């Protein structure tokens, strides 16, 4: 298997704590987090990565106060509209994964419009995980298998391939590097299937403070690791 970094996945954690440290509302941290998201996306697009997946809104985030959820929905819609030119000018393909049926029709239409407008860009894809959770994604894949069973599954490998083809990420490479900012050391139901052989990095840096230079340092560390993919390496 190839050890080149093609697919970077990030759990963007720490917006609320960053705002609290500055005696600001959580919304202030989310706004600053959007700027970091944009900076990191453009850096990745310019440094030959194939894919960047960002955990933007989880299936569990609906449990937050309604006022915060409403703000996040408005901010997401505004970002997708305002940054359209950023995607087009930088040849960035936009993809969304997750159970999008949980969103309003207006927001779904905004998501689909940007996906459609950028669908021909091939070199770099930014993926936003929206109303996403691995358990939800796998459950939807298994439901699809039960409702439309293929007739060619005769071993575990073919079953694994069939499941992979039914995931939201079916057209994306496997995750090579999974990074979480903010100091917590857990995966939070994010890309569990796709990260089977990913290298894991946890940094105490809060997401709004995270910079392309920090990412460069982590990627440098990534290339010092020996990825075995279950094999023995001499």
From Swiss-Prot:
Its EC number is 2.5.1.-. GO terms for molecular function: ditrans,polycis-undecaprenyl-diphosphate synthase [(2E,6E)-farnesyl-diphosphate specific] activity; magnesium ion binding. Keywords: Magnesium, Metal-binding, Transferase. One of its GO terms (biological process) is polyprenol biosynthetic process. GO terms for cellular component: cytosol. Substrate binds at residues 14-18, 26, 30, 58-60, 62, 64, 180, 186-188. SUPFAM superfamilies: Undecaprenyl diphosphate synthase. It comes from the Bacteria. The active site is at 13, 61 (proton acceptor). Signal peptide: none annotated. Binds 2 magnesium ions per subunit. PROSITE patterns: UPP_SYNTHASE. Mg(2+) binds at residues 13, 199. Its cofactor is Mg(2+). Belongs to the UPP synthase family. NCBIfam families: PRK14833.1, uppS. Catalyzes the condensation of isopentenyl diphosphate (IPP) with allylic pyrophosphates generating different type of terpenoids. Homodimer. HAMAP family: ISPT. This is Isoprenyl transferase. It comes from Helicobacter pylori (strain J99 / ATCC 700824).
